[in-house]
Amino acid sequence: MRVGLFTNNYLPFRGGVTTAVETLRQGLEAQGHRAWVFAPAWRAPHDDPAFVFRYPSVPAPTYPGFALPLPFSRRWSRAARELDLDIFHAQHPFLLGVTARRLARSQGRPLVFTYHTRYEKYAHYVPLPEPLVASLAVRLASRFAGAADLVIAPSARIAESLADLGVKARIAVVPTGVPLDLFRPGDRGEARRTLGLDEDAPLCLYVGRLDREKSVERVIGAFGSIALAVSGARLLLVGQGSHEVALKRLAVASPASEAIRFAGSVAREELPPYYQAADLFLFSSETETQGLVLAEAHACGLPAVAVRASGVDEVVRDGETGLLTKADVEELADAAIGLLLDAPRRSAMALAARALAASDFSAARQVEVMAGHYRRLVGGPA
């Protein structure tokens, strides 16, 4: 099968959509299919492999470091025709997503759309009234989904919300998987030595973008209480984003400031030692469609304390692989303190977390499921 993946963000930009696209591309290639990525040009010169086609782009005015593709290119439209793609898979409902739809329709090929993002939660990036932008975003995304031949939802809750919005297209739940050979339990002491971390300190970890919608300030606030209750506790935050400066100011003002460290952006293939070194994963976002970093943490045998929210509660099994709380700093802190002080319970959750990741979030298995959907669309055996 020959698949075109059309995305508004891709490497070297890091985020959930980029990870999902690259996981799918690698998995398809590993299973004998061919996949090409159509993405915006990066802001700096960047060497790309032959499977990447870059559209001209402009800097996003409200998100430093993000490029917005100009979704018109005769050259790449011609390339898409010459590739003789079987499937056009859009990752967004606008810009290159619209390009994917146009090319799919002109060539009589199926259009697949993955609903990666709760777009109404990102309205603050558009310099217009947030309620207006949020409403328009929901309408645009649901209309685009309704025109697709298949809509992929990363979680059952997202599938339900799309149906509630009146999307009539067929919807399939296919979460982004985790490469289990990369993300796996490891030696905690060795991981800490590799990263230059104290081998004995109780370590809390956050991995993800440092953007407003991720509510990382709640993690930092909770850690202030954690540090008072758990002797020697440390917090390590991995990632970068538009809210980073504000979060660093918040960390400096925290009574636990000396115990908080920002590690910056880390390539996905270099993340496993961070998960392996930690004792507990902290997560407070309420805007996820899946919560991929939670699946990565679980694959490494790391339990999580997270705010109960759509997508998150389909990865973290409350009381089994971690704990889910209300969106409250002290409740988040209390749950984390309880687990940090209960090593046997944490160990049991670690085993359950790895088992859950292996059964429900294997990248190889999820790509196989996706390929089955592709085959049905082109009329082949599932």
Where are these regions (language model features)?
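Short hydrophobic beta-strand element within catalytic cores of glycosyltransferases
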Residues: 294, 303-306
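Conserved acidic donor-binding segment of nucleotide-sugar-dependent glycosyltransferases
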Residues: 317-319, 323-330, 338-344
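N-terminal subdomain of nucleotide-sugar transferases
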Residues: 1-54
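Aromatic "clamp/platform" in nucleotide-sugar-dependent glycosyltransferases that forms part
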Residues: 286
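Donor nucleotide-sugar binding/catalytic pocket of nucleotide-sugar-dependent glycosyltransferases
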Residues: 39, 56, 134, 138-188
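Short alpha-helical donor nucleotide-sugar binding micro-motif in glycosyltransferases
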Residues: 145, 265-266, 273-278
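Conserved donor-binding/catalytic core segment of Leloir-type glycosyltransferases
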Residues: 198-224, 236
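Nucleotide-activated donor-binding/catalytic signature segment of Leloir-type glycosyltransferases, i.e.
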Residues: 246-266
